[in-house]
Amino acid sequence: MKGKLIVALLGSFAASVAMADVSSVLTVDIQGPGGHSNGAYGNTNAVHAGVRAIMEIEKAIPSQKQCVVSGFSGGVSVNAIAADGHFKVSLNAKDEKEMAQLKQKVEAAVKKGVDAENAFRSVKPGQLTGGVPAEVRYTIK
């Protein structure tokens, strides 16, 4: 048997087993200005941007054998606009070339999701709110 055995538990009872020679786990961190829901209404929301990014990832890489998103977290309260959002993306590929393509798809999807949240809130790069950047930003490690 060549490669690694990757087991991804999806949902409560479903399981998917994939063969992969190359695997990688990316951490996506999304940051925004956050704020209290009353005084900062209309600010960009890092959790909303994260969900938009995940929807774009699922469109770009529909195979659960190649891509699994997990561990989403963010925000601090039900009545606060989330200043942060985080999730993991597990990728499985047959070789380094395919892995590079998958990583590019994740990068493009996250950018598209973040850009959509910024556009929805009509935020421009460099704009400030409460002395901090108004736009949602992201890093992928």
Which residues does each predicted region cover?
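Gram-negative bacterial Sec-dependent N-terminal signal peptides
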Residues: 2-19
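Metal-dependent amide/peptide-bond hydrolase catalytic core
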Residues: 21-141
